[in-house]
Every structure is written in structure tokens, then in C-alpha cells.
């Protein structure tokens, strides 16, 4: 299976078909008037492709601060479901709330890694920008 999308949102809801509704999609700029700060984001990972039904893969999520320190780390085995039909590839939608807290302003890096047994790992990175609204200057335009 391959990572198709890695998204951030304020919230996500899935229906019985697996379709997802996202609220506040692409919340990558955070204005925090105080330090330390804390809030939650919903991480959505969409995987697609062929895989051996009944097997497992390793999902890892790491959030690093602007200084390179680990602010959050998570790893879990994920079961791979069988495809809905022999003519349809497998799809997996994973939505999880992740805590987001820090002690500094700057660019935080969120890395998602997916690894199936016998396969090379693959990853996606998302930058999240934490700004002090008092220090922000409007862009020239």
C-alpha cells in the first residue's frame, strides 16, 4: 500500500462507506499568543493499493519542535483489510487526534511513516507554523 494523502484538520468524521468529512482542513498556521501552547489536530492518513489481506503494517507519527526535539511520537501496528472486491484496490483511512504542544514559536515538523513487512518504508512530512500574533507583520501585497 502507498500513502495517498496526509492531511491535518480540526476534526474528521467517517461514514459507513469510508468517506470522510473534514472540518478546518489544512490548519498549518497556528497563532498562539502565549507559550507554552497546547491544542489538538486530527491527522488523516489515506492509504491505497495492493497488500496481502490479513497482514499488518507499522504506522509511525513523529512531531519535532523547531529545535529538533521530539514533541510527540506514536507507533502502532495496523491490520490491512481485504479489498472490497477483486477489481478494487484496498483503501485505508486512518484518523487520529494528536496532541500538539510546544514551548517555542517556529516551524514544527510532522512526519508520518508507513512500513509493510518486506517493503521499504515510505513517509510524508507536513510543516506546521506556530506564530506569535503580536509579532506577525502583514505580507506586502
Locate the predicted segments by residue:
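Contiguous segments within soluble domain cores/interaction surfaces
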Residues: 3-141
Amino acid at each position: 500500500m502507498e500513502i495517498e494523502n496526509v492531511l491535518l484538520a480540526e476534526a474528521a468524521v467517517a461514514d459507513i462507506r469510508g468517506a470522510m468529512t473534514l472540518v478546518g482542513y489544512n490548519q498549518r498556521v497556528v497563532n498562539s499568543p502565549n507559550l507554552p501552547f497546547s491544542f489538538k489536530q486530527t491527522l488523516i492518513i489515506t492509504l491505497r493499493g495492493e497488500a496481502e489481506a490479513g497482514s499488518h503494517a507499522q504506522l509511525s507519527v513523529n512531531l519535532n519542535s523547531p529545535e529538533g526535539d521530539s514533541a510527540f511520537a506514536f507507533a502502532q501496528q495496523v491490520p490491512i483489510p481485504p479489498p472490497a472486491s477483486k477489481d478494487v484496490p484496498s483503501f485505508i483511512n486512518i484518523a487520529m487526534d494528536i496532541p500538539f504542544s510546544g514551548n517555542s514559536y517556529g516551524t514544527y515538523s510532522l512526519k508520518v511513516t508507513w512500513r509493510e513487512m518486506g517493503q521499504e518504508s515510505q513517509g510524508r512530512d507536513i510543516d506546521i507554523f506556530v506564530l506569535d500574533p503580536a509579532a506577525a507583520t502583514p505580507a506586502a501585497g
